[in-house]
Amino acid sequence: MKKQKNMSAVHLTKADFLTRVAKYEANPNEWKFLGERPALIDFYATWCGPCKMLAPVLDELADEYAGQVDIYKVNVDEEEELAALFGIRSVPSLLFVPMNGTPQMAQGALPKKNLKEAIQNVLLKND
C-alpha cells in the first residue's frame, strides 16, 4: 500500500511567526526559538521561478520529516517585515532553525539531496 501524502509546508503570517518561531518584538536582541521541533523556513515570492520549483520539494520533505522537522513558508511580498528582519534580498532564501544554536541561512533553490543533508546536519544532529 502506498503511503498517502498528507503533509505540506505551512504558510506563516507575522502573527503565526510570533507564536511558532520567535517573539522578536518582545526580544529584539535575543533569538529564542519557540518551536517544538527544528524548523526550515522558506522565504519565497509567488513570481519567483526557482521558488515555484522548490515548493513541491519542500512539501515532500514536510511529509518525509513529519513529526521531526516543521517546514514553513513566508511570502516576502505579503510579510515584508519578516523579510526585512532577516535581511532577505533574494528568493528563495532558506532559514534552518535548530532547537539549540544559531539559525543558518542559505540562498537559492537547493536540490532535494542538499536539503536533506542540511536537515540531517543542521537540524537533526545531536549536540
PLM features per residue range, with description:
Residues 1-18, 124-127:
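N-terminal targeting signals for export/organelle localization
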Residues 11, 43, 55-81:
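Thiol-based oxidoreductase modules, predominantly thioredoxin-like and allied folds used
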Residues 13-39:
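A short beta-strand-turn-helix
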Residues 15-18, 80-81, 113:
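Acidic phosphotransfer microenvironment of two-component signaling modules
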Residues 36-39, 43-47, 90:
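Short pre-active-site segment immediately N-terminal to redox-active cysteine/selenocysteine motifs
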Residues 49-52, 95:
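Cys/His/Pro-rich metal-binding microdomains
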Residues 85-89:
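A short glycine-leucine-enriched loop at secondary-structure breakpoints
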Residues 90, 95-127:
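Non-catalytic, surface beta->alpha helical segment in thiol-disulfide oxidoreductase systems
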